[in-house]
Amino acid sequence: MKILGVTGFILICLLAISVLMDMLQGFSLTKAVYNNMSSFKMTTFAEWVVLLFFVLVLVREMYVIYKSKKKNP
């Protein structure tokens, strides 16, 4: 659970930095958020496959850690 929390925290921090950099360049808040989300619309199939692979690796690692802690209390 810590791994998922840290991953989410890092994602939120990076998105916030990206929005703030857009706002420093003169974009409004709504336009800066739209610029960040539009990058997900333009991804190719191969990029989605790589993203899915990384998510599956993350879930697998969480499962392995959970199982190892359950066996050795």
UniProtKB/Swiss-Prot annotation:
It comes from the Bacteria. Keywords: Membrane, Signal, Transmembrane, Transmembrane helix. One of its GO terms (cellular component) is membrane. The chain crosses the membrane at residues 44-66. It is found in: Membrane. Residues 1-22 form the signal peptide. The gene is yczF. It is a single-pass membrane protein. This is Uncharacterized protein YczF.
